Amino acid sequence: MNPIVSAASVVASGLSVGLAAIGPGIGQGTAAAQAVEGIARQPEAEGRIRGTLLLSLAFMESLTIYGLVVALALLFANPFTS
């Protein structure tokens, strides 16, 4: 295996996990803060807010999992090596 391709794959896999976690991390923090604020304003709507929050957190977390899958593909099933 070419050492340059191997090194680039390791760097790219690290970047894919890191960059894929930044956006969802910020989004999850914002969503949780807004959910807590909404529950504080309308305690009777807590069930609907919590359900919507959990669904949206799952969608946001899937983006991070996609980044992990790309990183694992670059590390173990690298299409750029022969």
UniProtKB/Swiss-Prot annotation:
Please give the Pfam families that the UniProt record associates with this protein.
ATP-synt_C
Q: Which GO terms describe its cellular component?
A: chloroplast thylakoid membrane; proton-transporting ATP synthase complex; proton-transporting two-sector ATPase complex, proton-transporting domain
* Annotated SUPFAM superfamilies: F1F0 ATP synthase subunit C
Under InterPro entries, the record lists:
ATP_synth_csu_bac/chlpt (IPR005953), ATP_synth_F0_csu (IPR000454), ATP_synth_F0_csu_DDCD_BS (IPR020537), ATP_synth_F0_csu_sf (IPR038662), ATPase_proteolipid_c-like_dom (IPR002379), F/V-ATP_Csub_sf (IPR035921)
Task: Indicate how the chain sits in the lipid bilayer.
Answer: Multi-pass membrane protein
Q: In chain numbering, where does the site feature Reversibly protonated during proton transport fall? A: 61
Q: Which compartments is it annotated to reside in?
A: Plastid, Chloroplast thylakoid membrane
Identify the main location: plastid
The protein's matches in Gene3D superfamilies, at most eight in alphabetical order, are given as:
F1F0 ATP synthase subunit C
Give the molecular function GO annotations.
lipid binding; proton-transporting ATP synthase activity, rotational mechanism
Primary role: F(1)F(0) ATP synthase produces ATP from ADP in the presence of a proton or sodium gradient. F-type ATPases consist of two structural domains, F(1) containing the extramembraneous catalytic core and F(0) containing the membrane proton channel, linked together by a central stalk and a peripheral stalk. During catalysis, ATP synthesis in the catalytic domain of F(1) is coupled via a rotary mechanism of the central stalk subunits to proton translocation.
Name used for this protein in its record: ATP synthase subunit c, chloroplastic
Gene from which this protein is expressed: atpH
